[in-house]
Amino acid sequence: MRVLNVASEAYPWIKTGGLADVAGALPAALAEHDVDMRTLLPAYAGLRQRPETRPVHHYADLFGGAASILEARLTGGLTLYLLDAPHLYDRPGGPYTDANGRDWADNAERFAAFCRAAADIALGILPDWTPDIVHAHDWQAGLVPAYLALSEASPRPPVLFTIHNLAFQGVVPRDRLAALLLPPDSFSVDGVEYYGQIGLLKAGLHYADALTTVSPSYAREIQTDTGGMGLGGLLRDRAAVLNGLLNGIDMTEWNPAHDPHVKAHFDRHSLEHRTINREALRTRFGLDSSAGPLFGIVSRLTGQKGIDLVLNALPFLISQQAQLVVLGSGDKGLEQGLLQAAQTHPRQIAVFSGYDEALSRQIFSGADAMLIPSRFEPCGLTQLYAMRYGAVPIVSRVGGLADTIIDANTAACEAGVATGLMFQPDGEDSLIEPLSRAIRLFHQAEIWERLQHRGMETDSSWTLRSTAYVALYTRLLSLR
């Protein structure tokens, strides 16, 4: 089975969030099931580990300039395609924003070109490989199913479209329709029209043959008027083809026994080595040695991620002689609130603005618990990384967090199945109760260690999760 994986980012080449981890891990996991998945990625200027390539297709003009599809053969027998279009992707800054954090004004055209190339590959433009299925991710790839459905080519491969976060919708003005190579009659409710504008995510949801999102709970939430963010009605209409499939993680890449960024390696049989990592983290940030727990946050600092709940809980955390290390950036007001708290309480709170992959691993390996108080969370990977590294996740009861964590209530603790602490994010002080519970359990060493053990034993691998994708691909092919 041949599958084209269409994603605007994929680890290790380019990463801004969880989409990259998923898109980067799927091909290797699916290869174990004899699925030849090849990823198409824009050739951004900021690509890391750019592999050796050879051109396999040339465009004289693709959305305003010459472009080429490049092929790279990777270790492990995998193949990567890069869309090399310097006029669209050879720029300073990130994949979606300039060096000042502003969205590129032509993002719609940049990713329409990406989608056009994906559709061309799907229709057999490459000399020696044509996919049986196309798997497209998020709004940046939303026009792939649209271009294929609106084309006159036959046959065409079925398209699976995955929603990683419904909040990012790729909405652009109606007057860009022709510039995006969309026909006039596509601008309708049964097309790309979205409240008088063009919805690139909506296009993917409407035209794809099947839909997935990244957890069963989130699949239910986005069919409601509140969780659907303007697309709930469409998703209810498409409920028969909407599947909630949990994300996994690369258990080899995320392994505290071999992680090169971790000071002291450990596994579930040598948890005592985590104390070395905790002290290294405290030393790095000038925190006191303490008998209280060290909490960690690795997150975008936004309201969606519940960072305001963290700010509201800081006086309680400080009063309990607990500590907090934060890695992230985002909303300037929330970020400034955390920085101010760190300045006021430098021996208990530390904040690193931005993102640093090595530091994230050090926080996972040294923090006693990770705070993930999201208001909504499609799947979440942070809680999976936390469990893998022996940090107890404290999560809100939403989306994939609710699907992957077993709350440490009395019954679950007695049965030895608890993996974290869960709470309902329904009030401005709602994080205080789980923090209080976590601090109490932390001082009950036997229970806390069982939580760590159970989390580290949890199989969150793509090897396990990928079987659901293989079954869905097979079902899609059988319908053709």
UniProtKB/Swiss-Prot annotation:
Transferase is among the record's keywords: yes
Broadest EC class assigned to this enzyme: transferase
Catalytic activity: [(1->4)-alpha-D-glucosyl](n) + ADP-alpha-D-glucose = [(1->4)-alpha-D-glucosyl](n+1) + ADP + H(+)
EC number of this enzyme: 2.4.1.21
SUPFAM superfamilies the UniProt entry points to: UDP-Glycosyltransferase/glycogen phosphorylase
UniProtKB keywords: Glycogen biosynthesis, Glycosyltransferase, Transferase
Binding site for ADP-alpha-D-glucose: 15
Entry-linked InterPro entries: GS/SS (IPR011835), Starch_synth_cat_dom (IPR013534)
Pathway(s): Glycan biosynthesis; glycogen biosynthesis
GO biological process, one term: glycogen biosynthetic process
Gene Ontology molecular functions: alpha-1,4-glucan glucosyltransferase (ADP-glucose donor) activity; alpha-1,4-glucan glucosyltransferase (UDP-glucose donor) activity
A Pfam family that the UniProt record links to this protein: Glyco_transf_5
Any one GO cellular component localisation term in the record: cytosol
Family the entry assigns: Belongs to the glycosyltransferase 1 family. Bacterial/plant glycogen synthase subfamily.
Protein task: Synthesizes alpha-1,4-glucan chains using ADP-glucose.
NCBIfam families for the chain: glgA, PRK00654.1-2
Name this polypeptide is given: Glycogen synthase
Organism name: Granulibacter bethesdensis (strain ATCC BAA-1260 / CGDNIH1)
